[in-house]
A protein has these predicted regions:
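Short, ordered, surface-exposed loop/turn motifs in non-cytosolic proteins
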Residues: 29-46, 159-174
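Exposed beta-strand and adjacent loop surfaces of beta-rich binding modules
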Residues: 19, 36-38, 89, 150, ...
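Beta-strand-rich domain onsets/edges
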Residues: 1-33, 111-150, 154-163, 181, ...
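Structured interaction patches on ligand/partner-binding surfaces of diverse proteins
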Residues: 98-128, 229-280
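Short, acidic Ser/Thr/Gly-rich low-complexity loop/linker segments typical of extracellular
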Residues: 36, 45-76, 175-198
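A short, solvent-exposed beta-strand micro-motif common in secreted/extracellular proteins
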Residues: 86-98, 199-210, 214-231
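Beta-strand-rich interaction surfaces with strong enrichment in secreted/lumenal proteins
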Residues: 79-81, 178-181, 210-212
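N-terminal accessory interaction module
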Residues: 54-55, 60-120
């Protein structure tokens, strides 16, 4: 007896749009962050309707069933949506359960005015490279990968004496490379970076001729801090300031000596990195690095 193959008739075709997808990027490793994050989205006008992103096969964090956007997600074509569609505001919150990256929050407006993945909109010169993804920076609890240097310390506001939280730190090497980190609520920071290239590589011709071993190698680095807490924007329902406002803070003064000394403050601090050792940056005579927003009293 021959098997009877049932006939099927297409009754309905369902089409769904993904209105928010994000590629997270690790600038220290110059690689995508494909797992380990908890990414949530909450309507500003209804904080009880938080949804969590799912991870696609390619490591993109995406959202479905976004509150208030069902019509746009299921619209068959653009003509059925209307032009332009109304926008809604949401709080995007990112946390890393394993503690590799600093948690951040940002208000986003949906639907996006462009197709494709979310691009964080920061000022020109901001460290975030939107062409690669949404950059997250190393936390103080992250273990540096092999052959990576760690520039770390504790920031203190020279005016208030309180921890300088949510500052953006930049470490620049002589070859022009820049590496970034954020200070946490206690002012602690950690900037991870690969060791700068040696001028002549091992095994090359001619070989290194200065007689120094690898563990005797040093490099000059330049540290700068962007810190202007008065310019930070709050995020509704969050204890974190807006990520974009953190990245766009103004330049701060760094005090190599205690504030009030004849040396004063500088917008950059040049110091030396030693191979194989964390570089703990501090103001002379204390364990913290004193900074202040430019224009504030000290």
């Amino acid at each position: 007896m021959l098997d009877v193959v049932p006939e099927y008739r297409l009754m309905e075709r369902v089409k769904r749009r993904t209105l928010l997808g994000i590629r997270f990027w690790d600038p220290a490793l110059d690689a995508q962050i494909a797992d380990g994050l908890r990414v949530t989205l909450t309507p500003v006008e209804n904080t009880r309707r938080t949804i969590t992103a799912y991870r696609t096969r390619s490591g993109i964090y995406a959202f479905d069933n976004i509150p208030g956007l069902h019509v746009l997600e299921t619209a068959w074509d653009d003509d059925s949506i209307g032009s332009p569609p109304p926008t809604h505001s949401y709080v995007l919150d990112i946390e890393d359960a394993s503690g590799r990256f600093s948690g951040v929050a940002q208000v986003v407006y949906l639907p996006l005015p462009y197709p494709g993945l979310f691009l964080i909109d920061s000022d020109p010169g901001s460290p975030n490279d939107s062409t690669k993804g949404f950059s997250l920076y190393s936390s103080i609890t992250r273990t540096p990968p092999a052959q990576y240097a760690c520039v770390c310390g504790d920031l203190v506001d020279a005016h208030s004496g309180m921890p300088a939280a949510d500052a953006l730190l930049r470490v620049r090497t002589d070859d022009g490379s820049s590496w970034y980190g954020l200070s946490d609520r206690e002012g602690r920071f950690s900037v991870l970076m690969p060791y700068p290239y040696l001028h002549v590589a091992y095994g090359s011709s001619p070989p290194l001729s200065d007689g120094l071993r690898l563990f005797q190698r040093t490099w000059n680095i330049t540290l700068s801090v962007q810190y202007s807490p008065a310019s930070l924007d709050p995020v509704p329902g969050s204890d974190k300031p807006s990520y974009i406002s953190i990245l766009n803070q103004g330049q701060a003064l760094i005090y190599p000596q205690l504030p009030g000394s004849p040396a004063g403050g500088f917008d950059e601090l040049i110091t030396q990195l030693n191979y194989g050792r964390d570089l703990v940056v501090s103001t002379d005579g204390v364990s913290e690095l004193h900074v202040s927003p430019i224009g504030s009293p000290t």
